[in-house]
Amino acid sequence: MNKNFDKLNYNIINVIVYSISKNDYPTSNNLKVYQYSFVNFKPSLEMSQIIKKKKLDSSSSEDFIPTKRITTLEELENYERLEERTKVTITKEKIPLFAKNEMFRNIVRHSLNSPECRENQESDQKTYILKRWDLLPLPLRDLITNESIDHSTVTHKVKYEDITPEEAFKLVVNDDIGVMVGFETVGHIAHLNVPEERSSIKKLIAKIIIDVRAFEVTAFRNTNILKLTMDIELLAGEENYVANLVENGLKFEVDFANVYWNSRLVKERTRIRDLLDSDDIVVDMFAGAGPFAIYASKKGCSENYMKRNAKINKVTGLVKVFNMDGREFLIDVIKKNKILDKNTLEYDKMALKPTGRVHLIMNLPKIAIEFLGSLVINHTSSDTLVGLADNIEEENIRRFMVHCYCFSGSNEYENEIEQRLSKSIGTKLPEYTITNVRGVSPKKQMYCIEFECPVSILRGKKE
């Protein structure tokens, strides 16, 4: 094991979950997922699909070329420009005819086009402001020429609140490689991943995202990717990092300032849930807000927010929460209380069934492999090895399933992961599987290593 990790004290939330009901869990029909989005205004069609703006287009975003780059929030908020528009007056009876020829797809944000103005217009004539004449479809132009009462070119002032997301991003980005900012949304929060190339305009990008997506009122980025919890930099909106969300029918309350959460792991959480049997026991070594634990307990199988989420989902009696070093947790809770013993039928008023397997979930991919060495502990006072189940008769040891997450950027990731596994545990595993969970970056993937821990290792023997 890497000695540098031995010296570190990881005060990480740990949890034990027991499953009781095989049928009482949400199905994929209740799926409500907050997914990862990547913002890129090129081509604009993809952007419009990613970000829905409940405003009328001011003009064609594809044809818009800014004359000056905006560099400050004040400039963005006070932005305005003059554009040519087409003013059209028609009779009420011809509205269906013009609608059929896409007139209402080509109107722009203007007071004359507001529902209030149209409703209060007592005349049998209606006036609309459309896009610039040369941007209108040819059939519509012909119809206007032949069937309108009047049409003319007018000058219209366009402000920041009138423009499309594509136009807004073009105002702050002075190249053609796109915005390059990934973000995921959880409740009212947008978590931005801002590369160094865009750090100078991070607050401008955050403001545009907040203004476009009205349900989000907070945008932040994590300034320390090496820590499990985040060092938050508020980029736009309110300083409110407690989000409420629904995932696969389960309700969660997450404080981003103190607890790590990743909505992109929803499929992985579902996969792990589906591996569990109703009698199984789940040991979540790095539990955070408790997503894996809540999934498991609902199927039947930051400490404060874990408890709150257990209460919200009505599984308080099935979840036991600890806040301690991960290695100490395995020894002081799992080993000393003989959780791996089939004869242990109760722990802290929580019933355990002898047929249940124990699942150890280690979702701290940066260093989780280093903690696998805790399955066999080498006492400093002697050369003797101590396993998690060396105090249990061999025939009474529960099946112990390990789900350990890691990162790898190697093309030969199987060999690289195998070397790290063998180094940490001190022996070569006879059998294991590696599942590709998700892409973290173009050169890094997240994997889940899964194996049934051999009894020899649990008994402190490295063969």
Curated annotation (Swiss-Prot):
Its main location: mitochondrion. S-adenosyl-L-methionine binds at R269, D325, G326, N363. GO terms for cellular component: mitochondrial matrix; nucleus. Keywords: Cytoplasm, Methyltransferase, Mitochondrion, Nucleus, S-adenosyl-L-methionine, Transferase, tRNA processing. HAMAP family: TRM5. PANTHER family: TRNA (GUANINE(37)-N1)-METHYLTRANSFERASE, TRNA METHYLTRANSFERASE. This is tRNA (guanine(37)-N(1))-methyltransferase.
